[in-house]
């Protein structure tokens, strides 16, 4: 059997928490885990250049199958030599399957065994996405890590519906494996579903593990459920997954959830959060959230975060950034996006160091104390 394109190397476990330090090897380089992956929906992390992403330490980014299928079209990306070539990014890329967008963006959708009928959210055209189509698109994009096409039920969902959905997702996963035509160049991850139901998560994990994917994602979280529900589901789901393969929690990017996810054995995370909140002037800092549009920063000439050494904090003041964001200047959005991405990438570096030094539990306590996450009714992002 040929070498898998995706390989997980376990480095060590934190004695204090059990969190894992590891490294994932891909055809476009390796990255240490736990890792946060910036999201480049349309083959760009909004307002950031590939050079800036490398400068801040990003070794893997995510792109969206659904959006690239609609614009510019996977055939055009393939003609360009694949996504890496198209967007001038020579490090690892993960693509999602398009499933989440079909279920979250489209008003009209009809789920059948074959796949999903839905309307294009841009122009209302009728479209159809199936496991086979999702593989065809991702094979054309040429990402290092592809995701199986799954059903993303809403939260909360009735048990009976969720059971049928999990069974369908397992059948679709098998079809994805059969349709995947570049298994030596691209790794395909299965997605464990099951909502908050422990026995359904067990069933989903068992089905997918029998198919022997090179990695596994935990889907159906960060869809509106309370944080304690997410943590509880992770506590019984991550131990079900093979220890010698990467585990990816989809759609999670708030600092508290990244730390809590790592403590529960997760290796990979992605979310649009840092860039989305940056566009309206909400910033992550070592002392908690900072909304730079607030009037109190009008004459505040300090950097966004005095503990931060990013390009934004080394060069610009809160007052200047407030002015740019209030005037809708693109440069303001670039500065806030840079800072938030840098903050999360640096946070994950601190998490990895804490695992290395067996002190992630202490790190969490200090961080939550500083951020105010320990207070009753604490506000996350």
From Swiss-Prot:
Keywords: Glycosyltransferase, Metal-binding, Queuosine biosynthesis, Transferase, tRNA processing, Zinc. Residues 251-257, 275-279 are annotated as: RNA binding. Pathway: tRNA modification; tRNA-queuosine biosynthesis. This is Queuine tRNA-ribosyltransferase. The active site is at residues 96, 270. Binds 1 zinc ion per subunit. Signal peptide: none annotated. Homodimer. Within each dimer, one monomer is responsible for RNA recognition and catalysis, while the other monomer binds to the replacement base PreQ1. It comes from Bacillus licheniformis (strain ATCC 14580 / DSM 13 / JCM 2505 / CCUG 7422 / NBRC 12200 / NCIMB 9375 / NCTC 10341 / NRRL NRS-1264 / Gibson 46). One of its GO terms (cellular component) is cytosol. Its EC number is 2.4.2.29. One of its GO terms (biological process) is tRNA-guanine transglycosylation. Belongs to the queuine tRNA-ribosyltransferase family.
């Amino acid at each position: 059997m040929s070498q898998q394109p995706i390989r997980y190397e376990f480095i060590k476990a934190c004695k204090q928490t059990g969190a894992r330090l590891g490294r994932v090897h891909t055809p476009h380089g390796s990255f240490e885990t736990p890792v946060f992956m910036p999201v480049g929906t349309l083959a760009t992390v909004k307002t950031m250049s590939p050079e800036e992403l490398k400068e801040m330490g990003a070794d893997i980014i995510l792109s969206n199958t659904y959006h690239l299928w609609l614009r510019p079209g996977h055939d055009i990306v393939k003609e360009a030599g694949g996504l890496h070539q198209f967007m001038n990014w020579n490090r690892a890329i993960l693509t999602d399957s398009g499933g989440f967008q079909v279920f979250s963006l489209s008003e009209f959708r009809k789920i059948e065994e074959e796949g999903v009928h839905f309307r294009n959210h841009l122009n209302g055209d009728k479209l159809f996405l199936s496991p086979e189509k999702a593989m065809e698109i991702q094979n054309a994009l040429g990402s290092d890590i592809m995701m199986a096409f799954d059903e993303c039920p809403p939260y909360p969902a009735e048990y009976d519906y969720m059971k049928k959905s999990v069974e369908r997702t397992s059948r679709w996963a098998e079809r994805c494996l059969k349709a995947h035509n570049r298994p030596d160049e691209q790794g395909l991850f299965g997605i464990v579903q099951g909502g908050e139901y422990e026995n359904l998560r067990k069933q989903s994990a068992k089905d997918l593990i029998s198919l022997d994917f090179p990695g596994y994602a935990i889907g159906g979280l960060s869809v509106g459920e309370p944080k304690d529900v997410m943590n509880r589901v992770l506590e019984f789901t991550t131990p079900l997954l093979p220890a010698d393969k990467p585990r990816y929690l989809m759609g999670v990017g708030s600092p508290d959830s990244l730390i809590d996810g790592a403590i529960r054995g997760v290796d990979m995370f992605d979310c649009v959060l840092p860039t989305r909140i940056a566009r309206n002037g909400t910033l992550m800092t070592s002392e908690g959230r900072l909304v730079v549009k607030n009037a109190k920063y009008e004459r505040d000439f300090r950097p966004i975060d005095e503990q931060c050494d990013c390009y934004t904090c080394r060069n610009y003041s809160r007052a200047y950034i407030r002015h740019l964001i209030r005037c809708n200047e693109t440069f303001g959005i670039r500065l806030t996006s840079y800072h938030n991405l840098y903050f999360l990438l640096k946070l994950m570096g601190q998490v990895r160091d804490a695992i290395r030094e067996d002190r992630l539990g202490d790190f969490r306590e200090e961080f939550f104390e500083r951020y105010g996450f320990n207070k009753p009714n604490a506000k996350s992002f």
